[in-house]
Amino acid sequence: MSATDFDSLYQLIFNAGLVICFGLGVISGGQR
């Protein structure tokens, strides 16, 4: 696995984490 593959994979995971955190925040905020 090359450094570029690892970098793009890390970026994908990081972006997914941001989306999930943001989504959970919106969902929990809307339930209040």
UniProtKB/Swiss-Prot annotation:
Keywords: Host membrane, Membrane, Transmembrane, Transmembrane helix, Virion
Membrane listed as a keyword: yes
Record bears the keyword Coiled coil: no
Location relative to the cell: Virion; Host membrane
Membrane topology: Single-pass membrane protein
Transmembrane segments: 9-29
GO cellular component, one term: host cell membrane
Pfam families registered for this protein in UniProt: Inovirus_G7P_2
InterPro entries in the cross-refs: Inovirus_G7P_2
Family named by the database record: Belongs to the inovirus G7P protein family.
Role description: May initiate with G9P the virion concomitant assembly-budding process, by interacting with the packaging signal of the viral genome. The assembly-budding takes place at the host inner membrane. In turn, G7P and G9P are present at the end of the filamentous virion that emerges first from the bacterial host.
Protein name: Tail virion protein G7P
